[in-house]
Amino acid sequence: ADPDDAPPLPVAVRSAPGTVWLLGAHRVACADSTDPEAVRAAMGGALADAVWTDPPYNVAYSSKAGKIANDDMSASAFLEFLRKAFTALIGVMKPGAAVYVAHADTEGINFRAAFRDAGFKISGCLIWRKDALVLGRSDYQWQHEPILYGWKPGSAHRWYGGRKQTTIADLGGSPFAPTADGRWQVTIGDRVLIVAGDAKVEEVVPSVLVDARPKRSALHPTMKPTALI
């Protein structure tokens, strides 16, 4: 079974703003993540030791799985949106708690500005190197996502990762991956080949000079693999 698959729901369920679902040791809130009170309610009074967050990238992304809310704003509106979300987030974290923010390079300035404005310390930027690129209209085809890394000041920062961790997360995966348009991508070292049905082979240049990304999800259009987190 895919470790990223969620178990099936036993019955039809409904939710409304303010609802907090208790799923074993987990809590899931139907709420506004820019509202500090709603975020505190989701945490149930607890403070986080570490945070992973995957906000909208403001790239107007859409797929068969649907669209992402708050993903097509002006630069100024998006910056304010991030400031509110990060401010609500830092309010439910312990001093010294680590934070990871997946984001898009095209909005890197806004993500970093909002990160600092909320009070976080930036320590670095990690790179998730995917096993498959995403074909688009960019000159360089995107095969990575950046992840801001830092922590909430106010207490000693603790690190448990040893001294062998690097800023590039390459989680492996098959060298063969289907693309959205029915072709196949073949990765050979740092080379990426696209193979069409007529056996035509084209080499493309990815954005990173790999855990496999989920090929599709009916629940979220840009799902992250569990191993990455």
Predicted regions: what they are:
Residues 1-228:
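Core catalytic lobe of class I
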